[in-house]
């Protein structure tokens, strides 16, 4: 057993993606969440350290936590997740990240678009139309100050807090509620960033408009049992979705020949 855990997961960090300071800031955030009794899975401190090196690779060791994807068509499950997201954000709002980035246009749209074009990843027959669509989207999203960092005319009072950052259903594992510690637990905080609270909610929505509105209502019902939710942030859902699509396109392209 490692530090009392019968099974652990060793995570190796892709060289060059995160600095040691950024990784340690993620680990510190996970430790804050666990200290606040939020069911997040963070790295173990071995010999007083959470970040280790071997063969030129940085790695961490975390307890293995099993589970399945949550049933997001269950109102009780959504409310439960909403309550824990509020608690994550309560901790996240205590202080800002110093080293980790934000969910913004520069990181999630401009840089990925420029990279895809520079590396000729977009087929020539659609490149012009694709670039025009991206530029139009970026220009529209730039009107939201919460995502543009500067300028912007709408939502200028939106507060940016520390987030999980990649809160889609695959990063929430559910265990039976009749077992000790049952319910949701949150994994994979390595995309933790600063951003508006709604970033951690919108990726849990699926289905048609009516279904998504119902799911959102249940998430917010749970959320507001612990923390107020700013409904003005709902206007950011489509801009955030667009940023993710552009960013994810570059993420996939960069790993096209990756043996991992």
Language model features with spans:
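ATP-binding pocket architecture of kinase catalytic cores
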Residues: 3-99
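Hydrophobic alpha-helical segments that form the core
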Residues: 108-111, 240-250
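Activation segment
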Residues: 15, 67, 184, 192-194, ...
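A glycine-centered beta->alpha junction motif in the catalytic cores
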Residues: 15, 58-72, 116-124, 245-259
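Active-site activation/catalytic loop segments of kinase-like enzymes and analogous catalytic loops
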Residues: 197-228, 244-259
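A cross-family kinase active-site recognition segment
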Residues: 71-133, 158-160
């Amino acid at each position: 057993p490692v530090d009392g855990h019968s099974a652990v997961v060793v995570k190796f960090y892709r060289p060059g993606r995160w600095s040691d300071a950024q990784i340690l800031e993620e680990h510190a955030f996970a430790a804050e969440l666990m200290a606040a009794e939020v069911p997040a899975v963070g790295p173990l401190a071995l010999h007083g350290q959470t970040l280790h090196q071997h063969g030129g690779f940085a790695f961490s060791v975390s307890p293995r936590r099993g589970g399945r994807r949550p049933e997001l068509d269950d109102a009780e499950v959504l409310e439960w997740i909403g309550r824990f997201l509020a608690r994550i954000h309560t901790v996240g709002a205590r202080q800002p990240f110093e080293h980790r980035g934000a969910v913004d246009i520069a990181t999630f749209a401009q840089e990925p678009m420029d990279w895809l074009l520079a590396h000729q990843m977009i087929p020539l027959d659609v490149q012009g139309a694709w670039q025009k669509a991206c530029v139009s989207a970026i220009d529209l999203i730039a009107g939201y100050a919460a995502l543009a960092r500067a300028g912007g005319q709408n939502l200028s009072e939106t507060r940016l807090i520390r987030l999980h950052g990649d809160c889609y259903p695959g990063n929430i594992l559910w265990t039976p509620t009749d077992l000790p510690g049952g319910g949701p637990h949150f994994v994979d905080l390595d995309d933790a960033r600063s951003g508006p609270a709604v970033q951690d909610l919108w990726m849990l929505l699926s289905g048609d408009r009516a279904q998504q509105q119902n799911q959102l209502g249940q998430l917010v019902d749970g959320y507001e049992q612990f923390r107020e939710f700013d409904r003005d942030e709902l206007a950011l859902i489509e801009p955030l979705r667009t940023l993710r699509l552009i960013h994810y396109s570059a993420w996939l392209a960069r790993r096209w020949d990756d043996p991992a």
